[in-house]
């Protein structure tokens, strides 16, 4: 069941209109991105557009395939634009992503793209990051204790291994790493937070997107 489906559908229809012939488009995850992909597939059929898509997860790659759309990779092409959802967006367009767990590949495709659209309904707009959602990090399995110790010292926060629904143990990423979630208790500058995360040994990536020139599209 998709929450706020009407608002998300409206955003999806708007973003699909940006597609032009022979473009390469990066596809993020989340329900709004999925609805946008469906709208893009309709546009491909209706207007006969030749589009190539770069997926950020196996799940999205499966959807692209089911819709009969063409796929490529970052090794073969550079995205003209990228679209994705977000869990939180602050007033300076810093964002937290990653409830789906694909944020490392999402950040790769985001950084590779010329134009970046973040599609959210108004419930995702916050005064400061961490207000509603924890910050997800991807951690090398052997480094869980080391990362926990470092973040307790640097942030005063204890990350928790994200439990996997339906099976024992934690969520494993497509890279074979563990996802941990950090509850951000105090208001902290996103650039400073990014620096702390990047300087923590054992973390391979985070759902904090800061310093990107993004265009936020909301209902």
Where are these regions (language model features)?
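N-terminal active-site beta-alpha-beta segment that forms phosphate/nucleotide-binding
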Residues: 1-84
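Conserved phosphate- and dinucleotide-binding cores of soluble alpha/beta proteins
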Residues: 3-10, 58-219
